[in-house]
Amino acid sequence: MSTHSRSYKIRVPATSANIGPGFDVVGLSLSLYLTLTVTVPDPPSASGGADRPSISYTGEGADEVPLDAYKNLTTRVALYVLRCSGVQAFPPGLILHAHNEIPFGRGLGSSGAAVIAGVLLGDAVGRLGLSRERMLDFALMVERHPDNVTAALVGGFVGSYLRELDPSATQAASVPLSEVLPEYPPDAGPDWGRDPPQPPGGIGHYVRFGWAKEIRAVAIIPRFELSTATAREVLPESYARKDVVRTHIIDSEFKSL
């Protein structure tokens, strides 16, 4: 019997969010990338664990990223997408190589890129045919702010927001992250975590803004790492009316870009 393989290349851009007045709303994709090269034997290889792909990683953060499919963020997201879609495991023998150009913890959306790469990986290897809107639903179950992941998924200069859902859908979209991406124990087998919470439909929505081709982005990357959660802790709980009004005026200028 002849053996062939399916190959995929998935490339996800870095992003910058909170652009100008667009806090938690406006994101911009940048020309640094997380690239996955994926090979799936066809017919599937009988070697190795059913849902334990062979993972290699180069580039930024190569010495920090776990190569276990149950610990790596990208493959955990992919497995979440697969299991929500009725596919319980990765194809046996899957080989995944990741090359990353996006610095970690520097405000360039490294975690958002990893999440979107996982959604695209699950869709590709499971042959799911998910719509872009459904992919965003899965991403928003992991990254609860839409700005980075939306820009990483659709590219360009975008505004995004969370829709107002009915109570049952709101509850489904608000389950703890520990239930969406559980911490797999060392002895986790293929039956562990088989029934993850399904994302409701239409969690997020986005619109594209115009972007003049003459505009170029310059990113200044600090030498220190700072998590998004830590950075958000310095923000005040409320803002003066005059600041909100000024922000609205600035927001109206997006159309001139």
Predicted regions and their residues:
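ATP-binding N-lobe of GHMP and related small-molecule kinases
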Residues: 1-106, 123-130, 165
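ATP-dependent small-molecule kinase catalytic core of the GHMP/sugar-kinase superfamily
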Residues: 130-257
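Short amphipathic alpha-helical face segments that pack within enzyme cores
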Residues: 76, 113-121, 249, 253
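Gly/Ser-rich catalytic serine loop of serine hydrolases
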Residues: 101, 105-113, 147
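DPxDG-like acidic metal-binding loop motif
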Residues: 32, 108-132, 152-163
